[in-house]
């Protein structure tokens, strides 16, 4: 069973007994040099070997060799050997396949490396080409710069050459002019010497010629005077001796003087008549009365005004219920007065600014079918001496109205002040007297309406001429809400829905917002609320998208409130009473 241990013996040779194993020595060898017995010596490599397994294997081999199944065991061993060889061959194939796969991976890696190398070479070539292109561009730019510098240098040299040539030409011209001037001076000097010499030589002849010319001129003048005197004398003698000519001449001159004087006065009278009938006085700022010039300029508007029907006196005017009832009674009474051709009553409207006095006066005139004219008291004082004439022209012009005229005097306290206590000029005093003279009696031609913020400054004679006094107070919360809604509809809603203007309105509760604004604007007048609505419209137009938002309205309301407070502070600083407190005191 040598094959069991991997040892090949000769053919037909048996296997002897197993080789004896060397005995195990538990201890060391004898003593040696250096006292070897004192320390342990090196152990043998077979000292820890257990031979039991080998003995069992040898025993099994002997039994197998003497057994009758030795051949089958040998065949089995050979088959196992073949199986091992096949397994080794399979492993070899796997190894070869692994080697081939490794070669394939190496080839793929080499291809990838080659691709990367080519890509890197391409990138390097591109970078080299870009760098070469950059160098070429820089070289081209340098060439252009050099060429530009060369051109500039050539241009500079050409300019210098032209300047030198111009300087040389200028010097040549100056030299030529200098020589010409010298020659001219020499010529003039020579001519002067020659002329002086000739005059010295011909002095007697020249004096004789001058004497003869003077005598001839004197003789001519004397003869002309003598001839003219003779002609005038004979003509006057003939005119005086003929009495018919004298009479006709005197009559003609008299008629000429009368004609010139008559034409001058007739022109003045006609001008005053035309001014009173057709023109507009200088004190009148605004009027609804139609003039010839206005009819020629705006015929369509004039025709619409003539065909328009009387309007409601309180249309567009927001007042408190009590005041509204009172002014409506005044409007009805005025309209009936015009229908019955009776005498008009004079009205005084007083109160803070912006409460609707002027607006109601216009509406009252339109409701009554009358014309209106507006003048301001501040225009009277600057006229000086012409104030009396201008005041008479206003009342003369008002008396010529066929429909009746409502004369509205705004800021009347500016010239209708107290004559006893106020310091007014003589011209203004005379104008006030003329006003009192023309308003001393009621008229069926015009109705006088005065408006003032300080009625206590009126002259007592003015108060005596007032038939009705109406106090316009600041709007309360209900009136303010009506005003806010009216002006919001006029300046915001209508332009946003009807017009073609660039105005849009954001979505929010308009009614609630108007109520909130009316609550916040306490103490404001109707004019201030109107200005607030106009400011909303302006903010919408000023925005980029043209949309009026709730925040924009709130911001403008806060600005208006702050401005109103500032105005009230200024009024208190001046020592005047604010309109709200003044109204409450009254």
Swiss-Prot record:
Binding positions for ATP per the UniProt entry: 351-358
Keywords: Acetylation, ATP-binding, Coiled coil, Membrane, Mitochondrion, Mitochondrion inner membrane, Mitochondrion nucleoid, Nucleotide-binding, Transmembrane, Transmembrane helix
Mitochondrial intermembrane side: 2-245
GO BP: any one term: antiviral innate immune response
Modified residues (N6-succinyllysine): 490
Residue segments, region Disordered: 1-52
Region of interest called S100B-binding, as start-end residue ranges on this chain: 289-304
Name of this protein: ATPase family AAA domain-containing protein 3
Provenance organism: Bos taurus
Gene: ATAD3
């Amino acid at each position: 069973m040598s094959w069991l241990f991997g040892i090949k013996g000769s053919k037909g040779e048996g296997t002897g007994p197993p080789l004896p194993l060397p005995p195990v020595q538990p201890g060391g060898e004898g003593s040696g040099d250096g006292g070897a017995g004192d320390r342990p010596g090196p152990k043998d490599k077979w000292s820890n070997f257990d031979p039991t397994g080998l003995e069992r294997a040898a025993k099994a081999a002997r039994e197998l060799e003497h057994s009758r199944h030795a051949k089958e065991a040998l065949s089995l061993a050979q088959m196992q050997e073949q199986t091992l060889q096949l397994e080794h061959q399979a492993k070899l194939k796997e190894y070869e396949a692994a080697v081939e796969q490794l070669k394939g991976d190496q080839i793929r890696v080499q291809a990838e490396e080659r691709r990367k190398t080519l890509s890197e070479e391409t990138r390097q070539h591109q970078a080299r080409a870009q760098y070469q292109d950059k160098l070429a561009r820089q070289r081209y730019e340098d060439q252009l710069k050099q060429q530009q510098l060369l051109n500039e240098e050539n241009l500079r040299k050409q300019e210098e050459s032209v300047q030198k040539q111009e300087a040389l030409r200028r010097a040549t011209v100056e030299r030529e002019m200098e020589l010409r001037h010298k020659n001219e001076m020499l010529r003039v000097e020579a001519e002067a010497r020659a002329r002086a010499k000739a005059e010295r030589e011909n002095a007697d002849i020249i004096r004789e010629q001058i004497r003869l010319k003077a005598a001839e001129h004197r003789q001519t003048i004397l003869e002309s005077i003598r001839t003219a005197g003779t002609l005038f004398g004979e003509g006057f003698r003939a005119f005086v001796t003929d009495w018919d000519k004298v009479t006709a001449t005197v009559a003609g001159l008299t008629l000429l003087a009368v004609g010139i004087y008559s034409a001058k006065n007739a022109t003045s009278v006609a001008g005053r008549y035309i001014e009173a009938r057709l023109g507009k006085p200088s004190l009148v700022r605004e009027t609804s009365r139609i003039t010839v010039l206005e009819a020629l300029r705006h015929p369509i508007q004039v025709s619409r005004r003539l065909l328009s029907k009387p309007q409601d006196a309180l249309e567009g005017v927001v007042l408190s219920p009590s005041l509204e009832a009172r002014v409506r009674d005044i409007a009805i009474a005025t309209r009936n007065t015009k229908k019955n051709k009776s005498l008009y009553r004079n009205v005084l409207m007083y109160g803070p600014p912006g409460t609707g006095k002027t607006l109601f006066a216009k509406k009252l005139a339109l409701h009554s079918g009358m014309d209106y004219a507006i003048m301001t008291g501040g225009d009277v004082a600057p006229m000086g001496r012409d104030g009396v004439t201008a005041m008479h022209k206003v009342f003369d012009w008002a008396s010529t109205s066929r429909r009746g005229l409502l004369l509205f005097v705004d800021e009347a306290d500016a010239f209708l002040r107290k004559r006893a206590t106020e310091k007014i000029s003589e011209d203004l005093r005379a104008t006030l007297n003329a006003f009192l003279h023309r308003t001393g009696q009621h008229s069926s031609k015009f109705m006088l309406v005065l408006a003032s913020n300080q009625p206590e400054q009126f002259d007592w004679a003015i108060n005596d001429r007032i038939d009705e006094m109406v106090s316009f107070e600041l709007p309360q919360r209900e009136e303010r809400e009506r005003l806010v809604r009216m002006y919001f509809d006029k300046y915001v809603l209508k332009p946003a829905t009807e017009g073609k203007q660039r105005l849009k309105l954001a979505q929010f509760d308009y009614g609630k917002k108007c109520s909130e604004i009316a609550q916040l604007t306490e103490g404001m007048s109707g004019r201030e609320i109107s200005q607030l609505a106009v400011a909303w419209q302006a903010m919408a137009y000023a925005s980029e998208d043209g949309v009026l938002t709730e925040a924009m309205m709130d911001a403008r309301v806060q600005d208006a409130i702050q401005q109103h407070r500032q105005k009230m502070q200024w009024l208190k600083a001046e020592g005047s009473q604010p309109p709200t407190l003044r109204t409450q005191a009254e």
